[in-house]
Amino acid sequence: MAYNPRMSIIPTSQQNSRTRKKEEEADAFMRLPDREIVGCITDIGITFTVADLQKPNAAHVQQIFEWFAELLLNATRETVEPAMRAAAEDIAGEYADIIPSDTRNLMGFYVSLRRLLFECGITDFSFNDLYKPTYDRLVKIFSYLINFVRFRESQTAVIDQHYNKAESTKTRIETLYGENQENEGRLEDMKRNRKAMEAQVQQKTMRNEELKKRLLELRRNQERVAARLEEAKQKKGELTTALEQKTHEKVTLKQESTKLRPYVLQSASDLQENLAELRDILNNDKSHIDALDRRARALQTSTDSFSVVSTDVASCIKILDEIASELAKEEEELARNAKQRDALSERSNNAREVERTETMLKRQLSKWMERTEKLREQSNHKAHEAKEKMHELRAIHRQLTEEHTEKGKEMEVRRVRIEQTEKKMLDLKENIENEVHSAHEEYRKMEAHIKLYIAEMEQAIA
């Protein structure tokens, strides 16, 4: 017993009688005289008399209800038929034609009319009111409808204002949703392009690193070749000085031999001794000539190696030119990547702002819908609700101004960050340009040194 709900002391019959009395009092308050009802219906363009109200005709009553539905709900046969056809196709599928179109349209019209009358205050509307109308029921329904229309006409300005705001918010939401979809598509495309560009940049950086390693190896080989060339030049100078000394000694020996010839012819033993000496000298000269030939051959091989080195240097120069062109291309690609990244950040920021505005508009729309429902339900307290709405609108305005200021601050912070990143990119670009310029200067110096070495080699060979 402890868990059972508390039972009322008043009997149910008394409660039902009280509710009936309240309903009867409300009906009596809302009930209009027959002539007033007939006059209002005839004013809308439908012929209707007191006799038609007292002895109603189902077709005539349905015509009046159709006019009220068209006036208050914009529900006509043209608007109801497509929706009911789609519903029949969803339910029955291929057998949708089994349900007649008249019954479908009647069901849709009945649902919309019942919703309208429920908003007017009639909760017990049924098909009997359409097909078997009675005098009391028609007077009650028409009285409630006419009072609702009068109230609606008295509040047309407020209703139109809220309706226009709701429509504007709906159109704004639709446009923002479309823009959001477009921006999402663009953002996906830009993400794909960014991934592709990042892959290309990684490939270019790997290739650049490989080229840098190759360039360092070529520089080392060039230094080695230059050292070997200097050693060969030194050896060549030493050999040329030795050859000059030997030729000078040979000339002096020939002169001495010519001077000593008449003295040698005096005796055979002396001649034999002189011959032996001359043979020794001749053998020494031959060995010396052979050594000189060997040195000449070594010099020839060194000149051949110098020619090979010159071809290697020319290939190195071509590779350096290619590297410079590729570096320029990479700089252009880096600039394009930077621009695309900036565009991506801007579009992502725009998409976020659109989403924020969309959420704000949805919240505002829900608030406006709740307010319109409150206006319909609380018609007796208009002034108080208007004051509350003014306070709420001021609060919303303050919130919007605060959000606007916050967004402005965020935009300024983002702009400062973008400017800082642009400055960093410019500094990096200047550093890269300085490195490229220094590399070009080193390359020119090396080219000048190589040309000097080649010119000296040609002079030495000549």
UniProtKB/Swiss-Prot annotation:
InterPro entries with a match to the protein in the record: Kinetochore_Nuf2_N (IPR005549), Nuf2_DHR10-like (IPR041112), Nuf2_N_sf (IPR038275)
CC per GO annotation: Ndc80 complex; nucleus
Coiled coil: 172-462
Range of residues in the leader sequence: none
BP GO terms, sorted: attachment of mitotic spindle microtubules to kinetochore; cell division; kinetochore organization; meiotic chromosome segregation; mitotic spindle organization
Main location: nucleus
Residue ranges of the region described as Disordered: 1-21, 337-358
Record's keyword terms, sorted: Cell cycle, Cell division, Centromere, Chromosome, Coiled coil, Kinetochore, Mitosis, Nucleus
Alphabetical list of Pfam families matching this protein: Nuf2, Nuf2_DHR10-like
Subcellular locations according to the entry: Nucleus; Chromosome, Centromere, Kinetochore
Keyword Nucleus: yes
GO molecular function: microtubule binding; protein-containing complex binding
Subunit field text: Component of the NDC80 complex, which consists of NDC80, NUF2, SPC24 and SPC25.
Similarity comment: Belongs to the NUF2 family.
Function according to Swiss-Prot or TrEMBL: Acts as a component of the essential kinetochore-associated NDC80 complex, which is required for chromosome segregation and spindle checkpoint activity.
Protein name: Probable kinetochore protein NUF2
